[in-house]
Amino acid sequence: MKIISLFLIHSLLFLSLPSFAIENEEDIKVTKLTETDSSWEKTKIIYPNGDSKITALLVEMQPKAKMKMHHHEVPSFGYILEGTIRVQSESGDIKNFSKGDVVIEMINIKHSGINPGDTITKFVVFYMGTKNLKNTIIEE
């Protein structure tokens, strides 16, 4: 009987957790930043096969700093924390991203980025890769 009572008490506590977790939901605000199946220049996102590897980077670009031409083998996206970055693809497409913007990166398309402003640009990049693929390949 004691075992059954303990089981019931633990079960009730466990079942009450979800309601407790959202009891004060007015204190929590959720904002969808983006939802898409393609990158900013409309290339379809396809996840690679293999053992998963997630990488997150904080990138800080000084004013007027320019990235070398590069491409990504894996899907990635970024969130601009401060400043602006101007991205240009090898075909000449250009897009500016500023504080609060989500950047869905191009996959296997050469591109570069520049901080066109007079302040530091900071952004976080998340790569959804695999152990056998490089996140970024710098063009020589």
Where are these regions (language model features)?
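Positively charged n-region of N-terminal signal peptides that target proteins for export
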Residues: 1-5
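A short, N-terminal "cap"/entry segment at the start of jelly-roll beta-barrel domains
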Residues: 8, 17-53, 96, 104, ...
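Conserved short histidine dyad/triad with adjacent acidic residue
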Residues: 55-72, 107-110
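Short acidic-glycine-tyrosine-enriched beta hairpin
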Residues: 61, 91-108
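Short beta-strand segments in beta-sandwich/barrel cores
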Residues: 66-67, 84-88, 102
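Extracellular/periplasmic catalytic domains that process cell-envelope and extracellular macromolecules
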Residues: 71, 79, 116-120
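Glycine- and acidic-residue-biased ligand/ion/polar-headgroup-sensing regions
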Residues: 74-91
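Ligand-binding loop in jelly-roll beta-barrel domains
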Residues: 108-133
